[in-house]
């Protein structure tokens, strides 16, 4: 399991203390959304592996020339790799939409070339997408990518053996459609009515599995069945809006942590996921819930108790689904 380290706040602890908090909780993977030299340097010798993001503003520049990508790699990857920091993934932007999304693939290609030239080809380059890059998401087997550019990205990921990074939020699907989606089903709790995918017979007992398998179905239809999904963000707010309570947030995030060892009905086995987020971020724009996704307050006190080791759940029931809107 990993945890996303966002910094849209004015009251967060020093970077080194953040890394110490990750280590003390046994969190072995970190996602950051831009190059933070202090945080990356603090990872040296920590055993924590990094998903490093480019900013969305970087993407057009990286797409524009190989030399820009080469400069970015030499400034932002090579020094830290040489110092012993394990960078696993580079995320080319986060939830880029509209016309800017057309630059993602060129930026990924240039970064792949720059990494290979720097003998850093083991670092996988991808992009982090919103769930709504797919449409027809229920039943999961009917899902397809909504835009042609995603088909091209999927095929490129297959050619480089890189995963698709997907931000998957049952919270938003549930809060947008509580009439049809039950809270237990959205939060990994027992008692949810299983729902069968008529397209392939698989049965779903939680919304997260259905959403991830919808991504897999879209990848298959794009001609990229070998691409695995890494859940690059998932979480539940503890305050600020509908169903946003510490109890629900704890149920969801603990359920997610316990769940990742078992995979989904379509892709059983270990999966990789990053909880959003480490801290409540008091300067995040948008709805009030956006400022309450943290596992910890800025003073490092937990918002609710989480066991990061996980392991509570039984394996996935592979013959067992529930509907959800296209969020």
From Swiss-Prot:
Active site: 95 (proton donor), 233 (nucleophile)
Matches recorded under InterPro entries: Glyco_hydro_17, Glyco_hydro_17_plant, Glycoside_hydrolase_SF
Pfam families: Glyco_hydro_17
Subcellular location: Vacuole
Expressing tissues: Aleurone layer of germinated grain.
Glycosylated residues (UniProt): 317
GO CC terms, sorted: vacuole
Keywords, comma-separated and alphabetical: Glycoprotein, Glycosidase, Hydrolase, Plant defense, Vacuole
Molecular function GO terms recorded: glucan endo-1,3-beta-D-glucosidase activity
EC number: 3.2.1.39
Gene Ontology BP terms: carbohydrate metabolic process; defense response
Reaction equations catalysed: Hydrolysis of (1->3)-beta-D-glucosidic linkages in (1->3)-beta-D-glucans
Entry similarity comment: Belongs to the glycosyl hydrolase 17 family.
Its biological purpose: May provide a degree of protection against microbial invasion of germinated barley grain through its ability to degrade fungal cell wall polysaccharides.
Protein's recorded name: Glucan endo-1,3-beta-glucosidase GIV
Organism for this UniProt entry: Hordeum vulgare
